[in-house]
């Protein structure tokens, strides 16, 4: 299609469709270059890039301007905009006509611009500006303006023309609709887009710098805006300041800014090529790229310096050498480039958006995206592909440098697109340079050189391939409405000559020019950033100055307020001072009057005082005479009373002396009588002791001889009995054993009193002791052992000699053993040689043989025995079970007399004759002296006991002092004569009450001794435990221990014994022996019987003050008080007491024997309680 036809079609399409007036005539298939919206104000005029009215000398149009007066619109806004667009198109047509005729002069350009401004004022296109001749913030913040153009590198003169003679085509932009806000906004663009449609429909645009129109120095500012006001400045002022800032920088500062930008680009280039191959060709290419960048940046810096140095000259210095101009007027067309729709007019569909801040970026992005979505309609139809050479890809670099919401820089391309386009451009520049060095003058259409058109593989001579990713494919877009009108020219074919019209040098210069454009854009941002930092510092300083001014004004205001307050205070003081003077004057006058009155009153008072003084003297004389008379009478009375008291005291003294003499005489007589009595008692005691010693020696000798004879007899009888039992066992196995009745012999019943065996001991000297009042009770008698033991074999059990082996001696009588103990030390324990016992008549369950029987200590041929006077275990080892759980089948009749009958060999039945002969009872004291009996105890028949006639320590007890009966059960009563009835339940052990569970479950000794059948011993030397020597205080007692003290003792004696025991137990807890009274009290509470009253602290201290003796534990207590607490130290007697032999009698008439304890304690340990 001819050029005039394309021009007519284009114009008609603009006139017919108002919507498309804002769209470019050629739709970009790829990314479009966003040109900045530039607007400037010269005095009261602001140039808007809405239409092109004039052209430069190179045939391209400058930017028109519109005057902004703030005139309110009078007609519809849409109609006004439509008329303005039509006027702009008319002006564009005139401009095209003038270009074909050779171009206008500068005077014609100014004239046309003035006409266009007047026309804009008439149509009211200034409605988008506010009243103070500033752009609306929503419009001005999001885009570049002409005011910001002065911050650029400055390659333009004051008249807005390019300094390098290169044409600066501008685009016409119109208002656009937004989908959300439904209101129109206008955008301006200063860059021209040369649409190069390739075979695949892609296009690329050559971008030129915006035209920075500078205002003259005498430019007037808007009303209310001053240069010093930095908080609210217009874009024109900011542009001027950016320019001044750049010119004010020194050479080193400008060089550092350029160097920073160069280093950033070089660093990114090295990072991009870091992973490429390390061949020589690629290495040379990298080196060439770096050298090319160095050269380009050095040239760019030199041009910047020239611009800065020639800023004040008449004409602007050339920024860069004028390259070959490619365009309609020059007659040169780049390859694969379509001719423009109309000469010099190349609208662009995009804007260069500058990053002025976070809010501005968001506004710019939103407006750009909404405008594009609302304005541009794309079709899926692809234009017919036109074959092109791969060399034309070099000029596609500009198409990829579109950044929405940011600036158009080389750094943006490196960050957003990984620098692929820029790197490809630099690689091609390096290849051209290498080609020139090697004089390889090949054509660009040769496929063997460089990159293939659509591939990414380039072979090298060294035999390896480099895989370069292909450039991103660019979508082909087509405007549906402009498809018929504007793109018919794509069907034309271009000649090969036109494709090759650009020489290599022209392409290289074009590439360098493009790089300088991009470097200017990037450097522009550097300068703007530096300027913003400076402005921020100025604003910060201004803010500090304002704050300081405010603080200064505040301090002045406070000082003024303080000064006013001080003045008020002074006025108040003056007023108070005047009032005080007036008051003082009045008070002086009043005082003078009062003084005169007081003087008159004083005269009257003096007269009255003289009269009163005379009267007083008269009264005093009379009173003195009366007082002297009274004193004389009182002295006389006192003298008489003193004489009477002296006489009475003399009489009392005489009476007292007579009484004292009489008392001394009585005491002397009593002392003499007491000494005589004591001497007499001492003699009697010594005689008794001597007699007792002789008697004991004789008895021991006789007993030893008798025991030897009886032992021999028992051995013979035991041998005979074993032979008889062995013969009868076979005969009784086949028939039921007959119940052998037990003869009712009165002499075989054991005495109710304890029989104490007195062994033969050597005679020991008895120390002479004074008779004490505490030893007045009877001594325990030694009853005689009955001569016979009641035999009652278990029902259903035949006696048989179990566990006897041939050759073993017979067990003598009285040495019964449990079945599980060895008979002799060399014999192993006898197993279960007896079958389980049948249930006794009482209904009790069976117990295994050997329960509760004594064990034999190692190395002893016979077991330990119980106390004398009790039946010994049977020869077959079942004596204990028979005594504990089995009652005799026929109980022997009880004795009518309490005395034990002597053992005799009277006629017995055949069954009794077969039993072993009991050993004779030892010689003991008369049984009338009952062990442990007290005054007032009655026997079972209700008659007073003979022992109650003896005197003892109980005679000294007070009538109110009741003896303690803790643990004392009723005494066992004698069985009635002829009572042979069987008991319904097992009888308790001897000395234990059936009603007292504690007696049944008393403690056991650790030496295998049986439970103590007597309960707690009444002897003070006894440890109070059951059986033998046991160091354990707990003694395995399930129901509590018996009391450690004698139940019949007074409370003071029992408490002192417990205190002594507590101190001995706690002696090792303290190093110095001083014990806290609380710990002693707690220990005494543990020792105190459960039914006794607890010991208080006061009682404990009082009892510690008592003197110790053999009855109450001995020793002494030391008490001290520290920090409000009492501490006690117990000191025992220095010398231990001598222990008498077992059974040795005490003093005559004493109910207890001193130190005659059956179990004084284990060897090596002192008796409990200090005895």
Curated annotation (Swiss-Prot):
Biased composition (Acidic residues): 125-150, 356-384, 472-503
An example Gene Ontology CC term for this record: cytoplasm
Region (Disordered): 1-238, 307-392, 433-510, 545-739, 863-996, 1139-1171
Biased composition (Basic residues): 76-86, 176-185
CDD domains per the UniProt record, alphabetical: UDM1_RNF168_RNF169-like (cd22249)
Highest rank taxon of the organism: Eukaryota
Predominant localisation class: cytoplasm
Family label: Belongs to the NST1 family.
Function, in words: May act as a negative regulator of salt tolerance.
Record protein name field: Stress response protein nst1
Protein's organism: Sclerotinia sclerotiorum (strain ATCC 18683 / 1980 / Ss-1) (White mold)
Lineage, opening ranks: Eukaryota, Fungi, Dikarya, Ascomycota, Pezizomycotina
Gene name for this UniProt entry: nst1
